Amino acid sequence: MAALAIFAAATGAGAQQVPRLKFEKYTLPNGLEVILHEDHSTPIISVNTWFKVGSGDEKPGRTGFAHLFEHIMFMGSQHVPVGDFDKLLEAAGATNNGSTTEDRTNYYENLPSNALALALWLDADRMGYLLPTMDLAKLDLQRDVVKNERRQSYDNVPYGLVDETILKALYPKSHPYSWPVIGSMADLSAAALDDVKDFFRIYYAPNNATLSIAGDFDPKEAKMLVAKYFSAIPRGPKLPPRPSLAPIKIAKDTFLVLEDKVQLPRVFYTWPTVKAYNADEAPLDVLAAVLASDKNSRLYKRLVYDLQTAQSVSASQQSGRLAGIFQIDLLAKPGNKPVDLDKIVREEVQRLIAGGITPRELERVKNSYRSLFLNQLASIGGFGGKANLLNQYNYGVGTPDYVQEDAARYQRVTRADVQRVAKKYLSTPKIVLTVVPEGKTDLKLTSIGGDR
């Protein structure tokens, strides 16, 4: 889970508890899973579709396809001309978006209650009838859009190649997480129309998707509309088996340097840890929050407030379906070197391994997580509302209403748990990447204890 940004004031037994989400789930004959959740508090509905495909389902030499289709899915289908998808939704007062990760692709529409039929028709048409309009001109257009996105967000932005550099060092070349979600320029350029169409046929079929509807609707009407628009879409081919992968291990500390067009050096520490919903994930999230989540966290107080050697610090446990990492990220303040930051990071990590965390730190983080879950449940849709949560847990653990149990596992974390995972994972070999201004490779960290 991402590092926390908001800390709640609620404490003790009187704190609001995370409720269980009521839902109904069923499956159409073509394999499409449907999840319904009624909430009549406001006249709003969110339609949220998850396809169980991400960059982790791609192959070396064919990267970037999942993210490419995130764009293509907004470019019209057999009964929806190019440009009309957004126009029709905007005219109805709706908002929509999509996103791609290593593990899944999702799309949502947030709209007034009376526009449910419109959203379902649009989503069904692009799921079932996109390929008849898919030609080389459309592929080339979106290929150029994505390549430009890569230039602006990765290749030509300060620190933009950090993730790609770390992934290549951390994972074997054949591992599905060894390349970035956006793919490589070479693979995007080489993508053939037939290859892209085949990818869509396999992964964007109803038997590889879940449709979640949350908000102010009548369930009988919703079921009728879902059947009307989605039932005729044929089931896709048998999905290729996903590989069973051993946990990632690093034999020894690996020190990397990346010269970039930046003014300030930045250091990233990355340890291989656990995949999503592993028993150690919640303690690792708590550990990250104690180290570097806000102004009260240990690294922030030492590096940003007391010593004033860092401009920013963060820590996070990032868990995916196949693997996970624990990462600390530090940006040096002008006039300070990475070695100055490294000394404090090592001290604080060892202090935590040796002495654990305080009861107050644990309580503070638990309160923040309770607040985080409650804030997500306060929203119907979007990337973090109830419609998306139902899809997230349905995919991750097979239970759409897992949010209550997910919140509970953070409340069960003990100080001993946090100390245990700190020792178990942060005592192991890691990737250390130093990003330095061009021509300043002498600033890089080259050993445990700093530069030589």
What are the language-model segments listed below?
Residues A279-L287, V304, R415-D417, K430:
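PPIase-associated folding chaperone regions across multiple families
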Residues A2-L36, D218-E259, T270, K301, ...:
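Proteolytic maturation boundary segments
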Residues H37, T42-P60, G64-L68, V82-Y129, ...:
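M16 family metallopeptidases and their MPP-like homologs
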Residues L136, R143, K197-Y229, K430:
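Non-catalytic, conformational "gating/processing" segments within enzyme and secreted inhibitor domains
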Residues M75-Q78, G128-A137, I357-T358:
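Short, polar/flexible loop-turn hinges at active-site or ligand-entry regions and domain interfaces
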Residues R151, N156, L167-K168, K238-N296:
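His/Glu-based metal-binding/catalytic segments typifying zinc-dependent metallopeptidases
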Residues F65-M73, L287:
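Active-site His/Glu-centered metal-binding helix of metallohydrolases
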